């Protein structure tokens, strides 16, 4: 985690110094951060956006009490992929729909900013080793959200 201005400067300098190598390799780097939205926006826009972007974690944002709509409106054009996860305010990962993530707001906001990236299920584990059933439930929940809210 970047905690000081010096650490931030070192990270940004490193990324900028290695930008061309990363770009030439065809690699894109998605940064996941717990910075509050305006700080993350200011930070990520210091980097070339054809190589560096944001991995948006729905559950982490809910846990930190951030407004999904405000975040996505602020830097949605730089979101490379989305972790579909649910967490209560200040808590840990829970099954989708049981935390404070506002999936309607997330998917609607992503649609409005023209998001076309991946949705990655980073969900709570099955409690009774019925992993396939639980994953299918999460997949169906996510597809429902996309169908219902990721439209005009």
Where are these predicted regions, by residue range?
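Active-site acidic/histidine proton-transfer and metal-coordination neighborhood
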Residues: 1-53
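Histidine-acidic metal/acid-base catalytic patches
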Residues: 37-56, 60-152
């Amino acid at each position: 985690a970047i905690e000081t201005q010096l650490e931030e400067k070192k990270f940004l300098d490193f990324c900028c110094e290695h930008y061309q190598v990363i770009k030439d390799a065809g690699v894109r780097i998605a940064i996941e951060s717990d910075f509050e939205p305006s700080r993350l926006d200011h930070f990520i826009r210091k980097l070339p956006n054809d190589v560096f972007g944001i991995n948006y974690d729905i559950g982490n944002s809910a846990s930190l009490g951030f407004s999904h709509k405000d975040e996505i409106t602020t830097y949605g054009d730089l979101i490379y992929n989305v972790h579909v996860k649910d967490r209560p305010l200040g808590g840990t990962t829970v099954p989708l729909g049981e935390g404070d993530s506002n999936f309607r707001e997330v998917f609607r906001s992503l649609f409005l900013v023209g998001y076309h990236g991946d949705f990655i299920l980073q969900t709570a584990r099955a409690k009774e080793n019925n992993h396939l059933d639980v994953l299918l439930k999460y997949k169906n929940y996510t597809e429902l959200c996309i169908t219902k809210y990721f439209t005009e």
